[in-house]
Amino acid sequence: RELADRSISQPLEKLMDGRRLYQSEGIAEKCILPCEGSPRVVLCAAPIIAAGDVTGVVALLTEDRTATPDAAQLKAVNVAAAFLARQMEE
């Protein structure tokens, strides 16, 4: 909710344009912020691709800049992005 009315960051936008799953490497200096001024960083993210277009992103955020996602977290963002893409196509 605290990020609802903010624009996404340039690195997150580039991640979306890459059209592939992103996972943090656990290196604090390489963290991606979801938007400017956020206290959290992107742990993992998957673009929402509906009708061939990127329409958004599902991102799991964390305050731990050295965290890496586990298999369940990666699967969760992938499934959520695929579900939302199907809903947008209907």
Identify the residue ranges that each predicted region occupies:
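A short beta-strand signature within small-molecule sensing/ligand-binding domains used
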Residues: 29, 37-47
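Juxtadomain coupling helices with adjacent low-complexity linkers
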Residues: 4, 8-14, 18-30, 55-90
